Amino acid sequence: SNGNPPVAGLLDLDRKTYDLTAKTKSADLGYILKQDSLLGKITMDATAKGSGFDPKKMNSVFHVNLEEGEFKSYLYRGLLLDADLQNGSGKIVSSLHDPNITYELKGEGNFNEKYPSAKIALQLDTLNLLALHLLKDTLQMHFQLDADFPSTNPDALQGNMSIHDIAFSNATKNLHTDSMRLTAMHSDTAQQIRFRSEMADLDWNGKYKLTQVADAVKQLINNYYKLPGRPDTVRVDAQDWRMALALRPSPLVLEMLPALKGTDSVTANISFNSTEKKLDLQLLAPQVQYDQQIIHQLDFRADTKDNAINYSLAVADGSTKAFQLYQSSVSGKIGGNKLFTTILLKDKKSKNRYILSGALSPEKAGARFVFNPDSLMLNYDAWKVPVNNYIQYDSSGILVKNLKLEHNTESIADNSSGNTTTSPLGVEFSNFHIRTVTEFVSQDSLLLDGTVNGKAEVKNLLSNPLFTSDLKIQDLVYKTDTVGNLVLKVNNEAQNAFAAHILLSGRDNDVQIDGKYFSGESKMDLKLKLNQLNLASFKSLAASQIKDMKGYLKGSLNASGNLDKPVLRGSLHFDSAEITPVITGEPLRIGSDSVEFDNDGFNFSEFTMLDSAGNKATIDGNVFTPDFRKYRYDMTFTAENFRVVNAPKEPNRIFYGKLNINADVNVSGDQNLPKVNANIRVNKNTDFTLILPSNDPEIQERQGVVVFSDKDHPVDSVRFKSFLDSLSSHAALKGMDVSAVIETDSNAQFT
């Protein structure tokens, strides 16, 4: 039942000769070799004739004809292989013509040396890795490879290789690239390696051994800074070489990494001489971009002069979605078993804004960093640092001593309570302005500010951290809003249990959070008391969506369960609230209506909103959710002459005017397929203008989705896109089932 694997012929183990023939019919190789999850049945015939068993000495001829064979649950068909081995020299010819893998292979080589010679010609016409069960994603490829290496010794590499007719494809893309060519030449005095491709060029000339290059560079650095864990006995031959490298964002690279779009070519030139302990390196990148992160005019240099390795990294400017850099640099030197560094950040007027300078030196099994006492600048201000400060690190923890940063009445002090890296680490704030740090991140606008006083302590930092804090933040500011005064008390003296007391007061705010969070189980037992939350204090949190916000939110919530399945119980109610969305422009007034939370989700019980004319809209019903990720709806929305749009005519609006409606809407279904049944009437008080996209909108097509971007009204396009992006961060909306009857009063005006 496991097949028939007969072998016939002659075998003389004493003389090491053989003349064998094997024929199988559905032999279960997986069963025989106890690898049935990998191998299956095979049908083949094979011959072996010759002498010897050592590949370097045997004189043998082999032939294999695999009619079909199963590997990883795929049945291969039509494999041919012929091999001829004669005293260490060999030739091989093979082909496979299968619907999902087709190739022709010719090769020869000499195996007598430690590093064999090799000559290969491979024509790969088809390779479908998904069909062959080698990958879970669709990937097919095609290429032709020709290689001829008289020596494959990496320290005396000689030969050439070319890969051309290169094509890749997956489920959505066909990718092509130009040929790749590698040439290596070796003599007693020099090694040359040249690589050419669409995405990269390399020229490497001089005296070097590939297997020793990394050790040679480490040895040079070791002359100036003792690398931890590196023995002095590593033997490296003399090296003297030059390298020129260019990296380009080719179409193939951009198809694989589209976030690099906008990146320019990166070039590097390196010269290295181990005997003279010389290094000269320059790397230039006019623009490096990854998604929304951009750096302009990156320039990195390193050289050896005056018994040191001098280095500098400079950028003209750089930015991320929330971060901006101007004329920034990191520079210094490595010498005398120390790494000296200075970080300089300038503002857009080229004025020094942040400077941090210090020295790193090896210390036992780790390292020690010391701040320069006379060169610290934070947000334009000079700060004092004690002379005997240091931060020491090893695998067991961090030891900080005498690290107190001071400017006038501001200070932040870090100190370990003991003299070992496992000692508790304490931080003490005194009149410390948060903007000193946050303006490093957001230099053009104030992100966060406030005055911090208090203490915090961390124990077992690198093993099982235990954290306690007693901090007060006076006049906490977020962007343009002053939120109030914040008290943060956290006790983590019991492992995996955080006891918290958080209090927000001032600016008409009175909010308190008390309870515990158990990190090991991600469980919580928290109580939120909103005695009064001033909505105006938090307008900046929703600045892109909310034009204005005032009034109060009050109530209480108990939070239990875990982060994957939180349970909220309680209610929140508004008090004289008014919210004006940016996109509609109509103020929505909410008197004293509530949102109730229970085990099933949250509930609106005749939740009423009034427009600026006092007309009413009501939401009633439930939103059911087991985890605040999946939702099911049972809600109604009714309105009587309610003004949903009241926006002035502005250059950046795609609609403006007044839009008044009567509405009777039922919403059911879930987040995957909301079901909406609506009756809507547009009333006579309507005077509404909708600006259609211009005649030449920018159209971007991505995998069947066409996006229209109105260039004449970019701000509203951005607002609408940000709204869609906010939806995409929640459960995916797969569709909508909408049934609507819409009537229009004859006196309603539309443009």
Predicted regions and their residues:
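Interface amphipathic segments
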Residues: 1-457, 461-556, 564-664, 668-751
